[in-house]
């Protein structure tokens, strides 16, 4: 099966190439935190030879509670991303929530992300596709992997084939998510790069009444399981103080564990990508 390669700057993204890391923090809590986190990600990924894209949200528009922290907003968020790009020379990715945001975000960010909860919103999908930017499409918790072909088709019909698919878990009853490992193979059949959002797959949505809980202790186990499928990349959030993070702290890796974590995953990815294919159909 041929696999499509997406290029972001000098980074090549494909299921049969070394994995790329979309890594950062959940939300732009502050400019200082974004710079601190990106500095550590850059240090570790350069040391290990992992292609890297910084990620964060300028607005968390789907928080459980009306009082939850959402972020700095579009204008300030884009200023922070510009500072990160200028300082560290890395591409950036962030999510878009409304059609009018698509072009202003694409003007600054190298990859724009379609949120899982909004992945069937045609007006948003088309607006994002028409920017011509690379799009990371999060698979909704309520969609089967084979249904992603319809979202891909919407983007393609709008003239954009610079697309990435991203698994982030499926609803399993109330307040729980599971990851169907067979789904990765199904999505890879579309030939676009497939990523695994291990952080949000660890969520327990609404598990803390007014916010999501999570299972940080299992991040290494789940990440290894995902990358063993031979994927284009990993989507990860890390925080210097997860217990006091303003969003999704229970799912975030401790930033001081990043090097040990990625060292093992790099070794696993190298091993898996060197296996010859076995035809079992």
Curated annotation (Swiss-Prot):
Disulphide-bonded residues: none
Entry GO terms, CC: cytoplasm
Subcellular location: Cytoplasm
Keywords: Cytoplasm, Lipopolysaccharide biosynthesis, Transferase
GO molecular function, one term: 3-deoxy-8-phosphooctulonate synthase activity
Pathway: Carbohydrate biosynthesis; 3-deoxy-D-manno-octulosonate biosynthesis; 3-deoxy-D-manno-octulosonate from D-ribulose 5-phosphate: step 2/3; Bacterial outer membrane biogenesis; lipopolysaccharide biosynthesis
InterPro entries: Aldolase_TIM, DAHP1/KDSA, KDO8P_synthase
One Pfam family named in its UniProt record: DAHP_synth_1
Superkingdom to which the source organism belongs: Bacteria
E.C. no: 2.5.1.55
Catalytic reaction list: D-arabinose 5-phosphate + phosphoenolpyruvate + H2O = 3-deoxy-alpha-D-manno-2-octulosonate-8-phosphate + phosphate
Chief place of localization: cytoplasm
BP term (GO), one: keto-3-deoxy-D-manno-octulosonic acid biosynthetic process
Top EC class, one word: transferase
Family classification: Belongs to the KdsA family.
HAMAP family the UniProt entry points to: KDO8P_synth (MF_00056)
Name this protein carries in UniProt: 2-dehydro-3-deoxyphosphooctonate aldolase
């Amino acid at each position: 099966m041929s696999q499509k390669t997406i290029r972001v700057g000098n980074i090549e993204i494909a299921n049969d190439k070394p994995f790329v890391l979309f890594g950062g923090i959940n939300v732009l809590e502050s400019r200082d935190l974004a710079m601190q986190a990106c500095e550590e990600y850059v240090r570790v990924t350069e040391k290990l030879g992992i292609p890297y894209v910084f990620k964060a949200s300028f607005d968390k528009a789907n928080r459980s509670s009306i009082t939850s922290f959402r972020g700095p907003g579009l204008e300030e968020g884009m200023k922070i991303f510009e500072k990160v790009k200028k300082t560290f020379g890395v591409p950036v990715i962030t999510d878009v929530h409304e059609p009018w945001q698509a072009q202003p975000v694409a003007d600054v960010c190298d990859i724009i992300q379609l949120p899982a909860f909004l992945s069937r919103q045609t007006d948003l999908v088309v607006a994002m596709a028409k920017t011509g930017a690379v799009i990371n499409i999060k698979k909704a918790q309520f969609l089967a992997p084979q249904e992603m072909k319809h979202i891909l088709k919407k983007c393609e019909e709008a003239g954009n084939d610079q697309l990435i698919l991203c698994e982030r878990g499926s609803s399993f009853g109330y307040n729980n998510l599971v990851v169907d490992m067979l789904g990765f193979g199904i999505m890879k059949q579309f030939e676009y790069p497939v990523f695994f959002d291990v952080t949000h797959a660890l969520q327990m949505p609404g598990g803390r009444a007014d916010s999501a809980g999570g299972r940080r202790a299992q991040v290494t186990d789940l990440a290894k399981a995902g990358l063993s499928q031979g994927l284009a990349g990993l989507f990860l959030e890390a925080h210097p103080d997860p217990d006091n993070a303003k969003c999704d702290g229970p799912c975030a890796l401790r930033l001081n564990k990043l090097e040990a974590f990625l060292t093992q995953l790099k070794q696993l990815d190298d091993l898996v990508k060197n296996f010859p294919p076995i035809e079992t159909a």
